[in-house]
Amino acid sequence: MKWVKNAVGYWCEDILDRKYLGQKIGVSVLDTGMIPHPDLAGRIMGFDDFVNRRKRIYDDSGHGTHVAGILAGSGKLSNGVYAGIAPEASLLAAKVLDDSGNGMVEYVMAGIRWVLAEQKKKNIRIVNISVGTQPGLDKAEEERLLEGVEELWDAGLVVVVSAGNYGPEPGTVAVPGSSRKVITVGAVDIAGRTGGAGREKWDYSGRGPTEDCIMKPDLVAPGTFITSCNADYRYRFRKPYTVKSGTSMATPVVSGAIACLLSKYPDMSNVEVKLKLRASCIPSEQTQGWGMLHVGRLLSAGI
């Protein structure tokens, strides 16, 4: 995570003084589930499984646990090396995708309804959705999904969604990242290039505009070769961390930054958060919406 944090201007005074690291901020993660990895221990407020209806918390894919570690991992098993962006935020895990990372719109909608029911009780302020539909989904189903994420937004939640990995052609932002209301995140690599390491096979980050000519993604963050929590760490010969790439990995970088912001300014509305993000991004020569996330500028009172 070192290069990720360097790339997004993470090491500002508020972070170095450990003042605003997501304290008292709840973040819901709609994904493949989550395990109580030591880096997340004690901060998972709840879990529900809308795929297999199991009661015990689990993640049979590893995707959701990796996302959660980027967002809020403490770095306990790495002496802080792989700590997430908001290591004191709390998490609410909704399993809406199966062990292959696939799912039905109904699973996501059920997860959304659950988050809305838990919002006030758990002080959920942010919803991280590292989920995107594959091209060719029925239009009616796309509309249901868009209505679902916009219902979250209208309830006052900050909704952060991945742009999808179907780039680099125009018009490749996945639903529900195409929603005008939500904050949509694309991915850059270590050199700041959109969607990968300068080779065609890594040039994956979804591009706008949407069918309605909306500029997307809204901003970008590092998403290529990201080291975070490994859901299989308990098995023999498995390491506590693993590497993944995608806009799914860039999205929790932004969600974590927003958790830090809300721990400093807890009265901010979701619209105010979005405007602060827009004002604080570092513009780029590439097609990257507002530009690159910059945590120091985001937390600054003067921007």
Residue map of PLM features:
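Solvent-exposed loop/turn segments at secondary-structure junctions
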Residues: 33-35, 50-51, 77, 97-101, ...
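Short glycine/serine- and small hydrophobic-enriched flexible loop segments
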Residues: 72-76, 113, 190, 255-263, ...
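Extracellular S/T/G-rich loop segment that most often corresponds to the catalytic His/Ser-adjacent loop
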Residues: 31, 177-263
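Subtilisin-like serine protease catalytic core
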Residues: 15-28, 32-46, 55-106, 122-125, ...
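Anion (oxyanion) recognition and catalysis
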Residues: 21, 150-154, 220
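Substrate-binding/access-modulating region of protease and related hydrolase catalytic domains
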Residues: 97-181, 211-214, 233-245, 249-251
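C-terminal subdomain of the subtilisin-like protease fold in secreted/lumenal serine endopeptidases
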Residues: 124-128, 263-303
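Protease zymogen maturation seam
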Residues: 1-25, 39, 138, 195, ...
